[in-house]
Amino acid sequence: MDTFSLKDNIFLPLVLSGFRYDEMNERLKPIAAKLNITDILDKYPYEVSGGQKQRAAVARALITKPKLILADEPTGALDSKATGSLLRLFENINDEGQTIVMVTHSTKAASNAKRVMFIKDGEVFHQIYRGNLTEEEMFAKISDTLTMIASQK
């Protein structure tokens, strides 16, 4: 919402749930630090870049500590540094027990996942499980699968 500061936008789900202001601030501090948005929390959406808006949206999703996070193209508006930071944050969150379902067209983003599902014509076409694969090996498997899918058209 353009009439709310980034901080107020992030707080919105907590306000609607009846949290006290001090509780909201305590939740926000570590998330804002991890997403590198502490210095812009008092700015309005029209005053920040697309990537900064994206990181504020991620903070709003994380502040409620959900068991399931739905992320639709979360790295789409981010530069490579911010993308890497967000993917590491998602990995840490996932390691703490939260499930993340991410829709992405980015092979780089997908190569960080534990499981990648390829959907074609509304059905699961192929799956890759990470297992012990490195990020580079996972990237290669995803790229090979995308090549296979493209050659079948």
What are these regions (language model features)?
Residues F4-L12:
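Short coil-to-helix segment of the ABC ATPase nucleotide-binding domain corresponding to the Q-loop/switch region
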Residues E23-L35, T145:
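ABC nucleotide-binding domain "signature" region
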Residues Y44-V48, Q52:
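Conserved ABC ATPase signature
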Residues V58:
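Hydrophobic anchor residue at the start of the ABC signature
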Residues I63-K67:
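A short, proline-enriched helix->beta-strand linker immediately N-terminal to the Walker B motif
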Residues I69-D72:
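Catalytic Walker B motif of ABC-type/P-loop ATPase nucleotide-binding domains
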Residues E123-T147:
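Conserved beta-strand-loop-alpha-helix hinge in the C-terminal portion
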